């Protein structure tokens, strides 16, 4: 391997090297500093005169006299079944004090979106144990369903609760979680590690932690390392894998930082123009392949800057993914956990994974009726602020009280409370029973007579 000393310029995490030999895009580079330290980097861009190398560590110590070695290889993730139960850095190195991973394979981290023709339609219900997701915005195996949050909201707690509780009810197939955190503080990293170890969720998980003071370049490869691991577990070993990526906003900020260092022409709000394509290369790696046992389901979590759902990051994410779960500041102020607002939330694949043979025959109708009643009660709150509660009719007061009851009993649940889908639907019926039967216009009469608490008590009596 030849060594060159042709460093022309250093800008942030980028090293500009005068061209010396043909190099490939994404090729790995070893940079040897004057004191013999070897730093790793990757070819980001190349032209006739200059090669741009992004360094995975700090560029401190790199100078014109540093040696540059082009390896001729791209980044590969060493994978093996013994990765389960391990905590790795954002660059894929063990940080839990355990031994190095003995790889069964080394896989390219770029991966590829699943061929649309080879995709199988998602249809298996995943139970998260959270009523606002399971009951009204159901997650289906093979889906990509993001959580839209904002700074200061408990999205990390929601992510950990899903990682602990997610399962396919009644299934004996192996289930695993790949959890990748990007740009988090050391305090958050310690919190994540302690929770995974304390609750026993680590046994079936692989955890990647990229810290806020780690290089931005590493942040751009962390989700790809996580997805490569998930694809190996799913499509080689037959696991059903849930991938949780948090926080995608930090990932996009890293893209913007690197784009600025490369002096690229910025797009919306300074983010690179190719951010849509870049995000799609991550999100589209979820799915089920026909004839293959495993599956990859994704829950990317992002914080909306300024609580703005029209910001480029949630906006582009919404185009690519199949719905969204919206974490709400107003519910959080009321002390409700998880503060998930079901009204702007949506799961586009929900209807494929619910109903008879999946969850329960009344699931769709109960969900629709809960939505309708809560939406009406929520609208009436605005009216009360203007005319006062006394001006409302008796019917309106019922729906107003229903909205409060829905938030207090259906939305609110404990951090370690794992509700089955039956418990969630029964709770929905309990709340709907506070309304007159003639107001349950979205539920068929035979379902009311079968599941309404009034008729159930008669049947049991």
Curated annotation (Swiss-Prot):
Protein's organism: Methanoculleus marisnigri (strain ATCC 35101 / DSM 1498 / JR1)
Family annotation (NCBIfam families): ATP_syn_B_arch, PRK04196.1
Function: Component of the A-type ATP synthase that produces ATP from ADP in the presence of a proton gradient across the membrane. The B chain is a regulatory subunit.
Name of this protein: A-type ATP synthase subunit B
Coiled coil start-end: none
Organism phylogeny: Archaea, Methanobacteriati, Methanobacteriota, Stenosarchaea group, Methanomicrobia
Protein's UniProt keywords contain Signal: no
Family (UniProt): Belongs to the ATPase alpha/beta chains family.
GO-annotated biological processes: proton motive force-driven plasma membrane ATP synthesis
Keyword list, A-Z: ATP synthesis, Cell membrane, Hydrogen ion transport, Ion transport, Membrane, Transport
InterPro entries: ATP-synt_VA_C (IPR055190), ATPase_a/bsu_AS (IPR020003), ATPase_A1-cplx_bsu (IPR005724), ATPase_F1/V1/A1_a/bsu_N (IPR004100), ATPase_F1/V1/A1_a/bsu_nucl-bd (IPR000194), P-loop_NTPase (IPR027417), V-ATPase_su_B/beta (IPR022879)
Highest taxon of the lineage: Archaea
């Amino acid at each position: 391997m030849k060594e060159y000393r042709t460093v022309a310029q250093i800008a942030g995490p980028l090293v500009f090297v005068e061209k010396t030999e043909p190099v490939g895009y994404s090729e790995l580079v070893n940079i040897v500093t004057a004191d013999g330290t070897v730093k790793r980097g990757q070819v980001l861009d190349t032209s006739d005169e200059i090669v741009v190398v992004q360094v995975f560590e700090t560029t401190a110590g790199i100078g014109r006299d540093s040696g540059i070695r082009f390896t001729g290889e791209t980044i590969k993730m060493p994978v093996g079944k013994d990765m389960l139960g391990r905590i790795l850095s954002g660059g894929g190195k063990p940080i839990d004090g355990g031994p190095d991973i003995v790889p069964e394979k080394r896989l390219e981290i770029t991966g590829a979106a699943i061929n649309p023709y080879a995709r199988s339609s998602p249809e298996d219900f995943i139970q998260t144990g959270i009523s606002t997701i399971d009951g009204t915005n159901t997650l289906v195996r093979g889906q990509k369903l993001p959580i839209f949050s904002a700074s200061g909201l408990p999205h990390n707690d929601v992510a950990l609760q899903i990682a602990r509780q997610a399962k396919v009810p009644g299934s004996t197939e192996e289930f695993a979680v790949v959890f990748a955190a990007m740009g988090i503080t050391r305090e958050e990293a310690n919190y994540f590690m302690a929770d995974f170890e304390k609750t026993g969720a680590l046994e079936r998980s692989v955890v990647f932690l990229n810290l806020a003071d780690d290089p931005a370049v590493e942040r751009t490869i962390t989700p790809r390392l996580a997805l490569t691991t998930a694809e190996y577990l799913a499509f080689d070993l037959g696991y059903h894998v849930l991938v949780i990526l948090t926080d995608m906003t930090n990932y996009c900020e890293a893209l913007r930082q690197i784009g600025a260092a490369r002096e690229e022409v910025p797009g919306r709000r300074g983010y690179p123009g190719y951010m849509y394509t870049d995000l799609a290369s991550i999100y589209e790696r979820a799915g089920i392949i026909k004839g293959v046992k495993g599956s990859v389901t994704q829950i990317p979590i992002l914080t909306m800057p300024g609580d703005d759902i029209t910001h480029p990051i949630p906006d582009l994410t919404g185009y690519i993914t199949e719905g969204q779960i919206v974490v709400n500041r107003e519910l959080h102020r009321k002390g409700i956990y998880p503060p998930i607002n079901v009204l702007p939330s949506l799961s586009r694949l929900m209807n494929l994974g619910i109903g008879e043979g999946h969850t329960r025959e009344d699931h769709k109708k109960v969900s629709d009726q809960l939505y309708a009643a809560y939406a009406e009660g929520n609208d009436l709150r605005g009216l009360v602020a203007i005319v006062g509660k006394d001006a409302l009719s008796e019917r309106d007061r019922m729906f107003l009280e229903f909205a409060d009851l829905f938030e207090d009993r259906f939305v609110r649940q404990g951090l370690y409370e794992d509700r089955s889908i039956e418990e969630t639907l029964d709770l929905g019926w309990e709340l709907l029973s506070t309304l007159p039967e003639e107001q349950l216009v979205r539920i068929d009469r035979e379902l009311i007579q079968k599941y309404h608490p009034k008729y159930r008590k008669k049947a049991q009596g």
